[in-house]
Each structure stands twice: as structure tokens, then as C-alpha cells.
Amino acid sequence: MQYNPLGKTDLRVSRLCLGCMTFGEPDRGNHAWTLPEESSRPIIKRALEGGINFFDTANSYSDGSSEEIVGRALRDFARREDVVVATKVFHRVGDLPEGLSRAQILRSIDDSLRRLGMDYVDILQIHRWDYNTPIEETLEALNDVVKAGKARYIGASSMHASQFAQALELQKQHGWAQFVSMQDHYNLIYREEEREMLPLCYQEGVAVIPARGD
């Protein structure tokens, strides 16, 4: 397995990242096709044996059960310092409403850490752009999460390049923690990100985490 620095961070991640949306209890959340824990654990173990150290999940995957399954498997099969764990915030989980308000972010990170059984995540990503919350409120809350030691870094996902550029500029102006990664829909067939997002990320030193787009 080959490893690379993740953008400007001190994280070294495997070239392959294991996306964990498929892991989750089928009777929780919106996807009945997910793999329950007994089927998920061998895949996570095999990924670790193959050298994958980068795991990406989200608070909303299978109503939080993806985080629970991934957290338990990593505790059993790996040392915390040997893996890079990323999760996301935005979508509804249980009675937590959708969005990126300060209250939602602060509650969500605590809930994610509890489900993962971890003291911190390596990357907390915003899953979407929140059109109903001022971006300044979102960015300041993310900065406070980093200052509290609950996330080492923050990342973004699924937004327009103009929105991402606005957020990066506001972070610079206020001295807030900067986005270090962009997880976007990008593959050999869908290459729209080559127009604006990838050049922006290259210019800003932001790592790109290609995903199928969920």
C-alpha cells in the first residue's frame, strides 16, 4: 500500500480510503441494503490487513450505526494512532435536525465520538452546504471543535467551488481552522470538478478525497 500526506496536514493516509456508508444495521436509517455488524467486521479487518489506514464514515449513515460498527471494529483490530478516521455532519440523525448550526455541530461531534468510542476524530467534514445557516456561524463552530481537541482537522464535501472559496477566505480572515480536504463526486466518468474545484484545491493546498457522491 502506498501512503501520502493529506494536504498540508501531518496525516499520512493510504491511497485507498475505505468508505463506510455500506456498513450499518439494515433496520436503522434509510438503506436496507447495508451490511450488519457481523458482515462488516471482516471487511474492515481485511482492509487493515491490506494496509488501508483511512476510514470515512458519517453521523447519518444508517442512523449512526455505521459509526458504531466502525468504531468497535477499529478498537478490536487496530491501534487508534495507526488509523485516520473521518466523519461528517449535516444530515438528520434521530431527533437531531438537519443542518450546520452551532448547536447542531457541537452536539453532533459529541454524539459521533460517543458512537465511535473515540476521544477525537482526525477529520470532521461538513457533508453539505447549509443554505439556512450563516456560513460564519458554521465555520466558527468548526473552529471551536478543533480548539476543543475533538477533531484534529476539518474538511468539506459536496458544494460549489464558489462556496468553498468563500469559506476558505472567511477562515483566513478570522484566523479560524482551515478546511484541509474536499470530498467530492469525481471519477473517470464524472469529471465536472476539473473545471473549478480541483484547480481551487490545488491552489489552496487542499487534499481531494474523490467519492462517488452520496
Where are these regions (language model features)?
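Active-site beta-loop-alpha junctions enriched in small/polar residues
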Residues: M21-F23, A58-S60, K88-R92, I126-W129, ...
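Active-site gating/metal-coordination segments in enzymes
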Residues: D95-Q125, H185, I189-R191
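Acidic (Asp/Glu)-rich catalytic clusters
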Residues: A73-V84, L113-G117, V146, L168-A177
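Active-site mouth loops of central-metabolism enzymes
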Residues: G24-E38, R92-L106, H127-N132
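Conserved, mostly hydrophobic/aromatic
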Residues: L6, L18, S40, A47, ...
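Beta/alpha (TIM)-barrel catalytic core signal, keyed to glycine-rich beta->alpha loops juxtaposed to Asp/Glu
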Residues: T133-D214
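Short, acidic/polar
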Residues: W33-A47, G99-L116, F164-E169
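N-terminal binding-site loop/beta-alpha segment at the start of enzyme catalytic domains
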Residues: M1-V83, K147
